[in-house]
Amino acid sequence: MESSRLLLLLAMFVFAGGFAHALWSIRAGSWKESRWHLLPMVVGFGLQCAFLAQRGEVHGRCPLTNLPEVFVFIGWCIVLLYFLVGAAYRLSLLGVFTAPLVALLMLPGFFTPMVARPLPRELSFWEHLHAPLAMIGYAAFALACISGVMFLIQDFLLKKHKIHALFYQLPPIHHLSKAIVRMVGFGVLVLAAMMGTTFLIEEPISGAKMVLTWGVLGIYAAIWLLMLRHTLSGRLTAWLAVLGFLLPLGSLWIVA
């Protein structure tokens, strides 16, 4: 097995193992707040870094040359943003819900051959910056989606009066609502900055890619505006965050 594939396999096992252990601990009632819960995320993130560094060395640039690499890079951005925002929003279980999504995003990279493609020409600074900014924006939308899932689970448990171990560990609903709005807003701003770089790139960009990306930006900007004006209920906000993430995820398949 080639080393890059081995790194992905190890990272998937670490993320999946951390998720399984957390669920078992919550179910058994033994879950306690501890920095040790970050360990699987830190180890998995390190393995992701090693994979991306290896692929970057092969390509001689940011490893975003095929769809499997794009998915791994988005997963890496999701974990990075989790480290930055998890504590700030008091979302202690965000990592638990993040881990399976990140593991799934790495799955295509493990099963799909990733052939190194030579650069047709030297890329400009703005071209190097363009794609990573898009991935960071999409990662923010992914975290909003995960926060939305947590909100909907808690809302369901409240409505069904199923107050068990998981309910007591989930963050308060108002924390989740704030996290959704802020992550959607952050994603919109980063994606807008990315679209701004397109005016500084001399080489023509695919029309389909431009239409899809502007579409994603426009729809998320409209959703963010509705959230800021408090015209949506908390549940509808969560559903928009969850279902809305299908749009950027689907656009990656189409563009690729």
Model-found features: residue ranges?
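Hydrophobic cores of alpha-helical transmembrane segments in multi-pass integral membrane proteins
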Residues: S3-V115, L133-Q154, H175-L200, A208-A256
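Glycine-rich, flexible loop/turn motifs
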Residues: G60, E122, L166
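Interfacial non-cytosolic loop connecting adjacent transmembrane helices
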Residues: V115-F125
